[in-house]
């Protein structure tokens, strides 16, 4: 979490973001599944971050990506971020059309462990009802990135895209399995980023035009 905060702060202090800019967090997450009405409890979380803060977020027993009940490669746009340690909640504004399902995500400081499975369900019961149909997402960076980004961006300038890679079996995942799971999500994410670039270009033109009109008006007044 600290690494994510430091990365955002470093980038944004080296180049001050402009009103037309966007902060987009693209990362992986675990999907905490829960069958409503079945009395089933969900797996809880604890994790060990690896390579470049990429965020592998959960830990469970003996399943490959192909054997999981969740579908690896699903992409979600986060509409609500809940910080597990502090209980704080953050709401990125989703103003533009997109092709993704929207979900609520919990950001924790540790890996997802089955031993703690009774903790998350009661605490995030509302998230279970309002987020993905059978659970919610879990990562280790979204809330930190939001809080660091809030110094430079408005809520409408921040987007959080999460690709599901596991449901709690991160110890059994290899780099190749993760690569395969994420590969299918790339085209949709690329299209979304292209749309944001178009919006960014339009905003810059509008700002430039507005500045020109202000300058012209100032000259007339003088």
Predicted features along the sequence, with ranges:
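Acidic, Ala/Val/Gly-enriched low-complexity intrinsically disordered segments
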Residues: 45-54, 60, 65
């Amino acid at each position: 979490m600290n690494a994510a905060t430091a990365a955002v702060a470093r980038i944004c202090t080296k180049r001050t973001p402009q009103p037309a800019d966007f902060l987009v967090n693209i990362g992986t997450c675990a999907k905490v599944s829960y069958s409503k009405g079945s009395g089933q409890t969900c797996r809880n979380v604890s994790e060990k971050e690896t390579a470049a803060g990429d965020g592998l977020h959960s830990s469970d027993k003996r399943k490959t990506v192909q054997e999981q009940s969740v579908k690896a490669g699903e992409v979600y746009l986060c509409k609500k971020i809940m910080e597990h340690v502090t209980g704080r909640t953050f709401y990125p504004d989703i103003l533009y059309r997109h092709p993704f399902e929207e979900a609520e995500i919990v950001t924790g400081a540790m890996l997802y462990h089955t031993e703690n499975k009774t903790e998350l369900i009661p605490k995030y019961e509302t998230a279970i009802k309002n987020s993905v149909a059978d659970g919610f997402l879990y990562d280790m960076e979204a809330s930190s990135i939001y809080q660091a980004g809030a110094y430079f961006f408005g809520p409408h300038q921040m987007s959080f895209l999460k690709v599901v890679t596991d449901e709690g079996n991160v110890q059994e995942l290899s780099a190749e399995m993760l690569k395969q799971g994420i590969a299918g999500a790339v085209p949709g994410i690329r299209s979304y980023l292209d749309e944001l670039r178009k919006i960014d270009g339009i905003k810059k033109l509008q700002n430039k035009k507005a500045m020109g009109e202000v300058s012209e008006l100032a000259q007339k007044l003088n």
